[in-house]
A protein has these predicted regions:
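Bacterial N-terminal signal peptides
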Residues: 7-16
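Patatin-like phospholipase
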Residues: 20-58, 66-362
């Protein structure tokens, strides 16, 4: 009799183990300004003690996921968005109070599109069309500031961030998606959000990388394959595989025409989808607060269903302690190395003199 009771108790204990050891992965779709929706979703998840063990994203989803993985809290993300700096990132304008001493831009031009004549071309004088409509200087600097310390702390391994992270970019040379899990975090995110026509692509090794949304706007399959979470939470801010409408602006239309269909259907039984077709244009950040609030509201509505699937709960002290421990490993951002490319010797020396760099530096 005692043996039967002991076997029954052991069986109950073993049955309870998977529930207490469940791992949760959160995947975030692309969508430009719509992607601010994910910040509200993360707020609700933390507020309700939902464990977040892995994060993944595409385009704007990759930015939000990477910020979370690098130790930024949802409240800090909301504050950054509300400060207005995100509008500066996507405008391409440099803040004169921060960077103008070292970065010089041309004056404002009322023209929508500027083209220059290449008089040194072997083929003779010809027009050279721009590769992008918005300068990437501002967002390149912003992403470096956001992610360089975390890259150093993780030694370039995204599994060693505060939360393991991956994102997806599109390799246009080999015509397919690329899952990014190592390297420079700012470079990976910048690759994932290089919207065609808007920002210039990133060149990494032999790959020419554009926005990950072209091939996979909702990378739940890479997250599931690489991290194997028990529960997947999907945050989707777009309508899905729909053709552009007459109301869409020209950049939205061009991007949607380039996109391949994405699988937005998560596996049944171990997933919860939080979704809204946020009705703003890709670069419209004027409604940021409302977009973030929408994500929070939708996540709260889905919370009863999600909590049924999650055995473990984590309080605010857990998240605060984990962030503090990771930030303690992050070194301060210091620019102590540089490379000048595409310049003649006299031009390189002029730049060094201008920024007062030691001539002995290569």
């Amino acid at each position: 009799m005692l043996r039967k009771i002991g076997s029954f108790v052991l069986t109950c204990l073993l049955a309870a183990l998977p529930a207490s050891a469940q791992k949760v992965g959160v995947v975030m779709s692309g969508g430009g300004a719509k992607g601010l929706y994910h910040i509200g979703v993360l707020e609700a998840l933390e507020e309700n003690g939902v464990p977040i063990d892995y994060v993944a994203g595409t385009s704007m989803g990759s930015i939000i996921a990477a910020m979370y993985a690098a130790g930024y809290s949802p409240a800090e993300m909301r504050a950054i968005v509300n400060s207005g700096v995100v509008r500066e990132w996507v405008s391409g304008r440099i803040d004169p109070n921060r960077y103008m001493a070292y970065y010089r831009q041309l004056g404002s031009n009322p023209g929508f599109l500027s083209m220059r004549i290449d008089v040194e071309s072997p083929a003779g004088k010809r027009l050279r069309a721009p590769r992008n409509l918005i300068s990437s200087t501002q967002i390149d600097m912003a992403l470096t500031e956001l992610f360089a310390p975390a890259t150093a702390a993780a030694d370039g391994d995204f599994d060693r961030l505060m939360i393991p992270f991956l994102c997806v970019a599109s390799d246009m040379n080999h015509r397919g998606p690329v899952v990014m899990r190592r390297g420079d975090l700012s470079e990976a995110v910048r690759s994932s959000m290089s919207i065609p026509l808007v920002f210039k692509p990133m060149k990494v090794d032999s790959m020419l990388l554009y926005d990950g949304g072209i091939y996979d706007n909702f990378p739940w399959k890479p997250l599931d394959r690489d991290f194997r979470p028990d529960v997947i939470v999907g945050s989707i801010c777009t309508e899905g595989n729909t053709p552009p409408s007459e109301q869409s602006n020209i950049m939205d239309q061009a991007f949607m025409l380039a996109m391949h269909d994405t699988d937005y259907t998560l596996p049944e039984g171990r997933s919860v989808t939080i979704r809204r077709a946020v009705d703003v244009n890709m670069l419209d950040f004027d409604q940021a607060e409302a977009i973030m609030d929408a994500g929070y509201e939708d996540a709260m509505a889905a919370m009863p269903q999600l909590l049924e699937k999650v055995g473990e709960r984590r309080d605010s002290a857990y998240y605060a302690g984990r962030r503090e421990a990771f930030r303690a490993k992050c070194p301060p951002l210091i620019f102590n190395d540089y490379k000048l490319e595409g310049l003649k010797r006299t031009q390189r020396e002029y730049i060094r003199d201008f920024v007062q760099v030691d001539r002995r530096t290569p």
